[in-house]
């Protein structure tokens, strides 16, 4: 899980979702997991 000030989708499988007010990117590729904060 990368924590970044700005999150962007890396590939077409990345999905942007909101969890508890935070922007989270989930993907089938575990390296693409990101969280804003």
Swiss-Prot record:
GO terms for cellular component: cytoplasm; ribonucleoprotein complex; ribosome. Coiled coil: none annotated. The keyword Cytoplasm does not apply. One of its GO terms (molecular function) is structural constituent of ribosome. The keyword Ribosomal protein applies. Keywords: Ribonucleoprotein, Ribosomal protein. GO terms for biological process: translation. NCBIfam families: rpmJ_bact. Belongs to the bacterial ribosomal protein bL36 family. This is Large ribosomal subunit protein bL36. It comes from Desulforudis audaxviator (strain MP104C). The gene is rpmJ.
């Amino acid at each position: 899980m990368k924590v970044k000030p700005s999150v962007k989708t890396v590939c077409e499988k990345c999905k942007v979702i909101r969890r508890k007010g935070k922007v989270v990117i989930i993907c089938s590729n575990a390296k693409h997991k990101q969280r804003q904060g």
